[in-house]
Amino acid sequence: MATWRRDGRLTGGQRLLCAGLAGTLSLSLTAPLELATVLAQVGVVRGHARGPWATGHRVWRAEGLRALWKGNAVACLRLFPCSAVQLAAYRKFVVLFTDDLGHISQWSSIMAGSLAGMVSTIVTYPTDLIKTRLIMQNILEPSYRGLLHAFSTIYQQEGFLALYRGVSLTVVGALPFSAGSLLVYMNLEKIWNGPRDQFSLPQNFANVCLAAAVTQTLSFPFETVKRKMQAQSPYLPHSGGVDVHFSGAVDCFRQIVKAQGVLGLWNGLTANLLKIVPYFGIMFSTFEFCKRICLYQNGYILSPLSYKLTPGVDQSLQPQELRELKKFFKTRKPKPKKPTL
């Protein structure tokens, strides 16, 4: 749901760069909330106060301020390949779901987005697992020194398949995620009492946040089990910090419910929901600012600080067409005649 309408005035590389920079900044500024979410999902520390603020304060005092950003570098690094794979997969699925007349239903479009997200997650899954391991370790006594060292260590100690531990939950969790997306989308016109094509920018932002809250809440139990499976390792102190012992995904569900009740599957949801508005707010504003810079560079607007269009420029032209048109008129510009005596 967190997508922007394609602007033909940007090149493919510029769109990817804008999305990458926006994602990197939003991830970095909300990293402490992501840390609190993962810590609550993997293991509830007995005898300590719960909640995102208490968790962040405890990590800060024990490991220092820098520890609040554990795993964020890996999360940012995986953003670019993940976005590229997701975009390529989405285009393939759109072609697959498009009918003979070139139309695609809204349900098919949502399914294409969900499947593309699932493909990109599977392809880049080892980096997500490593991010979880880095978050769970104590940076004062680290088991892994970084992305490459973690990849090498896990591969040597636990085998290649350990890098994909819990990946099945990504596939299963896509079902409630897609259902939540469709549920929100089908009720948008009822919520705003108006057609979708007339929604304002604040309304679209609210739609994205609402969809994220619903879909993440529905799929959160699968995310919790996935995080526990990612973190669990006999080679790490305290089995990776996992608070229940299990032998597989189904057994993990069973042990969580047995030890903590059904609501234990939603441990960390508060921090996750608190992250939604600032995350998408930073992402949208950063993307729009980067987009303005690119539009100014391409010659469509007069300044990156405003959306004032350049007079005489056809906004329907693509960047390559606009460059060729400028080059054409530049070569056709008459040379000044020399004065004759």
Swiss-Prot record:
SUPFAM superfamilies: Mitochondrial carrier (SSF103506). PROSITE patterns: SOLCAR (PS50920). Gene3D superfamilies: Mitochondrial carrier domain. The keyword Lyase does not apply. InterPro entries: Mit_carrier (IPR002067), Mitochondrial_sb/sol_carrier (IPR018108), Mt_carrier_dom_sf (IPR023395). Solcar repeats lie at residues 11-101, 105-185, 200-298. Belongs to the mitochondrial carrier (TC 2.A.29) family. This is Solute carrier family 25 member 43. The lineage of its organism: Eukaryota, Metazoa, Chordata, Craniata, Vertebrata.
